[in-house]
Amino acid sequence: APWTYVPTGFWYNADLVGEGKKYSLPTTWEEFFALGDKAKKDGIALFTYPTAGYFDTSMYQMLAQAGGMEFYNKAVNYDPSTWTSKEGKEVVDTIAKLASKDYTWSDTVANANADGGFKKNQQAVIDGKALFMPNGNWVIGEMAASTPKDFHWAMMAQQKFSADQKTYVYTYTEQIWIPKDAANIDLAKQFIKFMYSDKVVELMLANKSVNKETKEETPAPIISPVKGASDKLEAGPVKDSYTLTSASGTEAVAGVWATTKPINGFDMKATVYGAIDSLNTGELTAAQYQKQLEEAWTKLLENLDR
């Protein structure tokens, strides 16, 4: 059962991007890359990412955005045509273009593979070196110590492939599990029920993060998947990110890759996400990446834990 959820998207500086700001907010990938070309002339990169693993939520969203929920559900269950389809190729080509040196901040890959370097990539958005990055609202508390008081975060839904599409927002969820052989299953069920109570909703909303060095506390609300919970948030970027999921013409996406049996020598994270670093460095082409994903899906389908 889900006990918390976080909408994800592209985070940015609301004082730099948006209505009436230096850069307009793009809604399609075509507009997004055009913005990148404009920002590049100003010495600003379009994009950065904390680590390649942060492409998980981006890829889930892109699959739904490209082909709708039926295509998405087939893809996360390793449908063999996922990456040879028009929609799958569109996702691969977009990721390859986004991760290229033309649009991704020059220090991204080096930082992403250094201890603690993910924060340097996140800082690049704060410092105006890059416009957007994939993330969730936890980034606000994570970067609180190095964020200027007058900086304003915002999150946008990832871009659409065409203007007439509905907008998809991927929602990251965390789950509570009861082992099937648990000694106190009935008690565990009561605890899960308690997790949806008003008391827990309020406790989660009041959560704070503490800076290890300064001991300074920063609000870090955790949102329960209870109707109306996000409405209790204070006005600001966190509440705005939840409002996105219920906006007209928007559909929330959840779920993860289907579970498989252990596959000897196969690293899902490195194959699907780690390879994106290689798209940036030129060690891997979009066509090679597509082939790699196609072969991975064949292997994963064969080992699907049915």
Please place each PLM-identified region on the residue numbering.
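C-terminal capping/gating helix-and-loop segments adjacent to ligand/active sites or protein-protein/ligand interfaces
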Residues: 236-299
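Short, solvent-exposed loop/beta-turn-alpha elements that line the ligand-binding surface or hinge
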Residues: 24, 67-91, 97, 145-148, ...
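Short helix-initiation/N-cap motifs at beta->coil->alpha
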Residues: 27-33, 108-126
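Alpha-to-beta junction loops
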Residues: 43-46, 121, 126-135, 151
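Short amphipathic alpha-helical coupling segments at ligand-binding clamshell hinges
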Residues: 87-94, 174, 183-195, 203, ...
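Extracytoplasmic/periplasmic substrate-recognition and gating elements
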Residues: 145-216
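Periplasmic solute-binding protein
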Residues: 1-24, 33, 44, 50-77, ...
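Glycine-centered hinge/linker elements that transmit conformational signals in sensory
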Residues: 36-38, 79-113
